[in-house]
A protein has these predicted regions:
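Intrinsically disordered or compositionally simple regulatory linkers and C-terminal tails
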Residues: 43, 147-148, 241-244
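Catalytic strand-loop-helix junctions within cyclic-nucleotide turnover domains
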Residues: 112-123, 163-181, 200-203
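Cytosolic regulatory/linker segments at or just downstream of nucleotide-handling modules
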Residues: 170, 193, 200-244
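Alpha-helical scaffold within the catalytic cores of cyclic-nucleotide enzymes
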Residues: 84-98, 119-163, 188-199
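Short, surface-exposed loop/helix-turn segments at secondary-structure junctions
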Residues: 151-154, 175-187
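Regulatory cytosolic signal-relay segments
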Residues: 2-54
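Catalytic NTP-binding/metal-coordinating core of nucleotidyl cyclase/transferase enzymes
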Residues: 46-130, 183
């Protein structure tokens, strides 16, 4: 009798452990592909199209300068190796500073630093800027000492990025078709951040910060003046960390 009861308890325990292990594996996979916040929501069943919430956040939009030229000159495997090294620098910096990487689009990266994840709005802005500066530093180190798989690429050139940081309200949730959803952020603030990033090359800066983000920061910044953005009614003031 007692042995049979013990066997029964062991089966129940194994079943419970198995379910927990499956959930953990599923959580790890979702976190890897969607990010921690989005992955957690999907694991909890938030998979209805349109489900989500408005959030205030510092929005990060970045891309790789010269991507079109590189993609035309390099083979597919070489381009993938280069992008992986590049995204390792940028996404790693975002995650190091408690940001949420939402998606990679070609050479582009979309990330957020939700205010709710930080003690203050200032802390979120400081984290986003620290991540941007770390990403640029890591790219510099990559260019100076490329790993063997990058150094072996004949036609590669030093990697440069443009990063825009903007503050605004976005909708964080499921968008897409009934059979294919994407957990992302949308809204005017995302569009504005993308327009700002497009100015980084012409302004000669790797990091551009909008007035909305700069207002949270207590550190010297270069004032780059006001700039018109396509699709945005009023010109927007832009700032950047001082050049070294």
């Amino acid at each position: 009798g007692e042995f049979a009861q013990l066997q029964h308890l062991l089966k129940l325990f194994a079943l419970h452990v198995g379910r927990q292990l499956q959930r953990r594996i599923a959580g790890d996979v979702l976190d890897t592909y969607l990010g921690a916040a989005a992955g957690g929501r999907v694991l909890d069943g938030l998979i209805k199209r349109g489900a989500g919430e408005p959030i205030r956040s510092v929005i990060w939009v970045s891309d790789l300068r010269g991507f079109t030229d590189l993609s035309e000159r390099l083979s597919g495997p070489d381009m993938i190796a280069l992008l992986n090294a590049y995204f390792g620098c940028l996404a790693g910096a975002v995650l190091d500073h408690r940001g949420e990487v939402l998606k990679f689009i070609g050479d582009g990266l979309l990330a957020v630093f939700p205010f709710a994840s930080f003690a203050t709005e200032k802390a979120a802005a400081e984290a986003a800027l620290a991540a941007a500066e770390q990403a640029c530093d890591q790219l510099d180190r990559l260019n100076a000492m490329p790993p063997a798989e990058i150094a072996a690429i004949a036609d590669w050139h030093p990697l440069r990025t443009g990063i825009a940081l903007h503050d605004g309200e976005v909708f964080f949730g499921n968008v897409g078709a009934p059979a294919r959803l994407d957990f992302t952020v949308i809204g005017r603030a995302v569009n504005a951040a993308s327009r700002v990033e497009a100015l980084s090359k012409s302004l000669g800066r790797s990091i551009l910060i909008t007035e909305a983000v700069a207002g949270h920061l207590d550190r010297p910044l270069d004032d780059l003046g006001r700039h018109a953005l396509r699709g945005v009614a009023q010109p927007i003031a832009l700032f950047s960390p001082p050049l070294a």
